[in-house]
Amino acid sequence: MASAIALSSSTAQNKITLKSVASRLQQTDDPDIRVWSQSVGFHLQFSNWKCANAFCRFVTDAYNLTPYKECARSITRQLTSLSNYLSAQTGVSVSGTQFLLSPSDVEVPVAKTGESVSDIMVPSYSVNGTSMEFDSMAQLAQALTTGFTFSVNDAQIGNAPAQTGESVSGTGFIAEACPSCALYDKCPNCTSELINDDGSSQSPGDIPHWTHHKIASGIVNILSSDMSSMEDDDFANIAAHVKKALGTNSHPANNDMSKDQLNWLLNIAEASLIRKADRTALPMNAARIAARRGWREKLFNEPADKLYTLLRKSKDSFQKSAIWGILFEKASNAKHYTEIVFQDIVKLIKEECNPSNNFYFKVMAQSFLDHFRMLVIDNPDPVANLPKFILKLKPLNLKMIIENHENTAEGWIVTLTAVAELYGWLEFAVDLVPKIVSELYDLLTSATQKCFSMVRELLTNLNILKAESFDFTNPFWYALAALLSYFVTGFLPNNAKCSAIKQTLNGATTLVAGITAIQKLAAMFSAWSNESVVDDLSTKVIGLTEADNPTVTQDIDAVTNLQIMAEQLKDQIKLKTLDPTFQPYLPVLRNLMSTTDSVISHCAKRKALATQRTAPVCIILTGPAGCGKTTLAYAIANRLSAQKPSVLNLNIDHHDAYTGNEVCIIDEFDSNPDSKFVEFVVEMVNTNPMLLNCDLIENKGKTFSSKYVIMTSNNETPVKPNSTRAPPFYRRVRIIDVTNPGVMSFKYENPGQEVPSYLFSNDFNHLSMSMRGFGAFSKTRVIDPEGRKTCGLEGPPGQRVDVDDIVRYMQRMYRENQMNFKSEAGNNRLKTPRFAFVTQRKHVDTVYKILAAAKTTYNGYYSLTKDSFDVNEGHNIGSSVFVVGDDKEIPHNCKIFRCNHLAMFRHPELAHIEGDNFRAALGVTMSDQDVTLMFYHIRGKHIQDEVRLDELPANHHIVTVHSVYDMAWALNRHLSLTGKWQALKAVYDLYMTPDILPAALRHWMDNTKFSSDHVVTQFIVPGGTIILETCNGARMWATSRRLIRAGGISNNNGPEGGFRFGSIAPRDIPWSEILREFLNLISLIWSRVKGATIVLTALLLYMKRYKPRSEAKGKTKGGRGAIRHGGKGIVLSDDEYDEWREFNMEKRMDMSVDEFLMLKHRAALGSDDTGAIQFRSWWTARQMRESTGLDHDDVTVIGKGGVRHEVHRTEIMKAPKQKKKSFAWGEDMYAEGDGKIVNHVNAIVPVTGLCGEHIGYAVHIGHGKCISLKHVLKTGSYVFNQKPIDVTFDGELAHFQIQQPPSSAAPVTFSSKPTRDPWGRSVSTEWKHDTYNTTAGKMYGSICWTATRTQPGDCGLPYVDRAGQVVGLHAGSGGDSAPGRKIVIPVTKFKLPSNTVLSNRFWKEEAPTISYKGLTVQETGVNKAVLKGTNYHVSPAHVDDYQDCTHQPANLGAQDERYPVSLTSIVINNLEPYKQPTQGPPTEVLNKAYNMLVQHYEPLIPKATTHLEMGDAFAALNVKTSCGPYITGRKKDHIDPETGKWDETLRNHINARWSLATQGVPIPHEYQLGLKDELRPKDKIAVGKRRLIWGCDVGVAVVAASAFKEVSSAIMAMSEFDFIQVGINMDGTAVETLYKRLYTPGTHRYCVDYSKWDSTQPPNVTRMSLELLRHFTDKSPVVDSAVATLSSPSIAVFGGVSFKTNGGLPSGMPLTSILNSLNHCLLVGSAIIQVLESKGVDVNWNIYDTIDLFTYGDDGVYIVPNFVHSVMPEVFSCLSSYGLKPTRTDKSSAPITEIPLSEPIEFLKRQFVRNQFGVRALLDRSSLIRQFYYIKGKNTMEWTKPPEQIDLTSRTAQLQVVMLYASQHGREFYKKCLDYYQLAMEYEGIKLDAPTYDEALAKYNANFNGVEDCDLLPAGYDEHRLDKIVFEN
């Protein structure tokens, strides 16, 4: 609210207290404001609306504030509510409010009849205490407007007693702050004053005592959420006592409950009420809501981490519930606050925010006590056992192991294995995880069982000191008990709890009483601890219900997230209901669960309204009345579903009776005369959700959900064919004509008689049914598809059908509808396996009997069906098995096994005798896994309390549960890999609550994944027997009885079979199953010898360690061996010996072996001392020498230089024969790759397997969204060390989410082709997609050719286009036979991560485009017109001769007589070149030039260690430039000139862009177009040419400055000495350095300019320039975002449209001069390299070391040596082939030639000359002359008229500097300029005389040499020059 008040004085800078307001109010002379003061506070009285309005005016005037926006509406609403009542009482008009509030905003309360003025209280702002302060005048004004009580003596808020002081007359209204008064007949805040400190009442008849049964029963009702029997007075009375207890410690409520409990009581009541409307009746509900809203406003913008911390530390339930509300709101709207917030909050829900603070302390303390007990008590004779202890310790062996330890991976393996082997822990080390679980459990169990025994022993052993030391009345024990309370509950006890502790300890005067006291304390601590947990759950539920609001969760994603969090919270509450220690709070927990259930139900309903469904199948049974249509409808319904059908009646407007069953019957659906049934049917038979109209509250949101709809009608044509709704109606239904010939004949023959029953049959053979064709509205006609013929078209005759045909038709149509409908993810888990056994028709019965016998023998769960696939799988827990003939069509979702009838005849008795090995009897090849799946698959999870012995499966394992560890170990057999982790969690839960085993198992089964193996385990527990059977799903039986049952069937005797009857029937299994059994056997063998295997492996690693050993050769150990043994016993290998000898010989050193090894180690570790550097240089040369493969020898050379040792090659080097070139690339083409990935390195994340092995890669594209390949994700389990979620496959392409993405993201595009592979090399491809066979299956992609050899593990790396956007992913190569052939999977279109910032853009890829004057554009809806007019005026001195000037102001539009053309047309013409991208250099040539330029800059540019922060980056911008397309005006227009602070518009925009940039995500790259106001040559004006201005978005500019400001500054600092002259001072000594470089001996000079430079810049070159800048940055996400943004196509916004460029580089792009110059260098270098290589020259040196360049954007001077000079014509032709247009500097069409030494060089429109004063860069003379012709003034269309007012100061400075420049051209030209200057003095009013020629010459030279302050600014700073000394070109 603070931002809603505009202050004009300094009063807002200080806190404003109510006391100061009170003082000023008492001093006011306004008669309409009546004030009085008394002991309880300071009060206001408004006798009518005029007084209230006067008070508002006083606040405005006294504190100099102006309410507006939200603050004004808030204040005025409350004033209006007050005035409406006062108007009714006084009759005074309230029209004065209309100037503040619109009529639609006025909220008029309805006053109750008969109420007096004093009974109406305004719910308002409450203040209590003298120190109350307000942050803003808005809050103060609101408090004053609605009334307040200011307590000078900290008195309680309440009704004012009789006034003291000035009396108040009339029907005055006291606007006193009491938020709860409106909620009660007797306000508890007011009636609390009537309660005494002891709990009694001053008026016992009104308010009962605290101990009264009404108070107690009321509290119970609140906790049980059953408040229907409570009266309003009951609420008020309870709240009054609670308020008194919170303010007075002596109230008896504090003896029963603490203050935390009192607030907890209200929290529970509020959280337990399901409907928010019911909460208004709670005590102090309004104040509670106000408190939470206040916390929400204060904390909503705080970072998430701070909220988490506050949540864990806060003891304020209001603050905590407000924080939970904020967290739930942000997590629901995760797409606005990132998925990380949602995942963190889901985890936070599972935590208890008030856990025991001493969990680890307790574990450590108990562990210490256990060890101390072992040494002191359990070991009575430690001296006698000391030798045994030493022998067990084995200190000698341990010391040897430690001494031989090495701090390496291998060293740790050896050491740990040796220690484990030494102490016999090897098996323990192998099975470490289960042992840790067991030990931890035992330790924690011991800790919980010893608390009581320790206290008892302590009291027993020290009983003699009881009277003196254990006086429990001593305060020390209270403090000790309080400390224990803190350790147990996490909270220090308050007064009430301390009183309870004191009362308990006071009676502990004996040992027994002491033990009893300790037990009571333990129970109290446990209860208090649980109170905090329940309170924490209540605050979560309150926050959850506040988030369950359509204004908070506005879209389906937010609703889904809220439902997930509600389900998580419900699970947490559910676990507490299973905990016995929480049984006293069970009613409260159940109420909390009910509230969460209501939130879940509400979310589910909202999702159902937004979730697409499968369209139901609808038929209409038409025929005459009484023929049996309704009976037929119910018969069809019974065959379609086992459920009873739902019934709808369309004659009523509400459908509360609809039950949502699978079949719905609508009888006589068309009986409504208004034809409303048509729209109902169209909406019902649809994939969109259908919301039913229901009256009951609980049915609101009910949707139609039936699968099949059967309607009846007596009308042959329900909808006339001429109706506009006939086509959609008949397209959705199928009509079946039903007639009963027997009944009709009887009725005609026997009129008036009842139809006999024998005319009807149960199989409906009495009916004649004919199904019409699709779209038939009658028996012979169908709807015309185009609706032109009302009579329709001739249709096919009806098809005769029976009931079974109708049922099959409806089932088939529904399955087809499902195929067209994407089912929700997650339902696949309940998919039923289906097996089809196909045989000859005559053998179907035999196969059926064999399978039925096998099912009976082995108690299989599958359903067996013959000759049909129609089975209701919803009623079967197992798989579905079908036996069909080979003439039957088999559905695609069945596993097919074809039976061999010869095998059945060979062993027909096998299955009938035993029922086993049915595979041999059927002659099918079937794996054991399929057999297990078929027999024992369990669909879903089932819990059965009723146990029938004949239904129980046979046991595989029987486990007697002695501890939870036994349970966990047995459950391990049942679990899948992910389920094992859930088992560990179950162990912890069962440890915490071991007495609730059956209930906990039920809860645990809901979210557990079970193994695909069939396992049955019987658990014998103290409370009974549990039988668990699992196979994908699970069944569980629980009983309190003991069951004694035999063991089950082993694997060898199960349906998997084995060898029977002397191997007459061996099982026939696939080869894959045999391989699986072999690997299983190997694993079993290894498990038997795993200990020995580890020991042998460690021994091998130990033996491989470096050990001193003798390597002497020959018969003696002398010679070389003796030398090698020198050096302090160090032994060298042969290679090390040779290195030591060669190094000493070549460096002429006498280095010992020890010194040599030390030097080698220092060099290897990267030391930078002289010796290490020298050794690395020598080592590199030696390696290069040996890499040739030729022999070398050390020789001694004796010559003039003395004796020296050298290495000579002794073998002749032969030139290799060049292979014959062919189209097939050879192996040598792949040796240049260094394997370094260069494309979007920070956005590429690894995909790893379960054990951490590398599988491939994925690419992060922003907001946690990633793309990869299907075969990579199918193999890999983790992406960036986390599980991928929401995985979707589009062919081979996979896109998914990860919760913790990398810091950067890569841009993607769907409409381009790759030009570079992941390693930066060029790609050759036609980019035509097709299907290719690979080792990972068929893939749809394109073939690309690159010169990079790839290897397994490279799949998923990105290929990019010219702009660096990802267009495809690497999926495979041609292997060794064709390594250059790659398959690339294109990135197809899918929904990119949404973001509110990205939605704020003018060009949207998904939006439609239009053609606008030849450009493809999108409409923006915002017309940003191009600015008309010019600021240039003709000087008064040249009104008559301005035509003599070579330049004039640029074209002004269609009204300009010089060339009438609209400004929009000029913009369009300028954008034409941007429609097509220029070619640019070949990728491999550009890469080579890029690497050379980077190598050139490496020693010159320091690498930045960090990027600029947002504020620093903005400070580096020119604030006089445009803000871009989103914000109007210039940057300085949005900055406070005094404070420098940004306004809200600029701050919000930059913050939004910056938040994306910090994630590495590209931001919109858009520009506001304008036309440059400048002087142009008259020949340009004659053809309407005018240059564009690209106004860059300020957000893009800030991000670019943050990323590249330091690098660009470093480049500008070298402008005098390097290739880029941006920032150089052309009027200083730097030009002398340039001049020397120009005339380097042996070089040639070329001056070059370019036409249309900006629009012809190749995108791939710009991308490489940005990569070069990135190379010298910190490569942070902000840098990645800047590169991706500036590389993306720029968007031009103008005239209500936006245009997407395909090439070019906008002149307004950030760092445009630097980027243009880098582009210039890369283009020239690429052209030289390409031309030289085309001549057969291998450019293996850095080309930039041999040439010199001057570049500033498109201006260039090339200084080249002789060999480059010889090919310069081809270089310029090559530049033209790139799409550039190089020209001479004079813009003539002549070829570009070398500049002779006799001619001056022109650069930046200056000529380099040498005069008597030195080297000067002369400005063009015409540029100086035209300064006299034109003056800048106000914008005008009549530029030929002089300006009305001339800024003489600026004009004088401009012309003075012109004269200084003119002095450099000689006396004659200076005299000419002097004449112009004198004319200006005469006509323009300039007073300052021009300097003489000598004065001007001396001043310029002084400025040039730096003697005086220079006003001549360096090049590149045109923005300052235009503002000060203007030189218009």
Swiss-Prot record:
Residues 1235-1391 form the Peptidase C24 domain. GO terms for molecular function: ATP binding; ATP hydrolysis activity; cysteine-type endopeptidase activity; RNA binding; RNA helicase activity; RNA-directed RNA polymerase activity. The keyword ATP-binding applies. The active site is at residues 1271, 1292, 1355. It comes from the Viruses. Residues 1643-1768 form the RdRp catalytic domain. The keyword Manganese does not apply. Its EC number is 3.6.1.15, 2.7.7.48, 3.4.22.66. This is Genome polyprotein. SUPFAM superfamilies: DNA/RNA polymerases, P-loop containing nucleoside triphosphate hydrolases, Trypsin-like serine proteases. It comes from Canine calicivirus (strain 48).
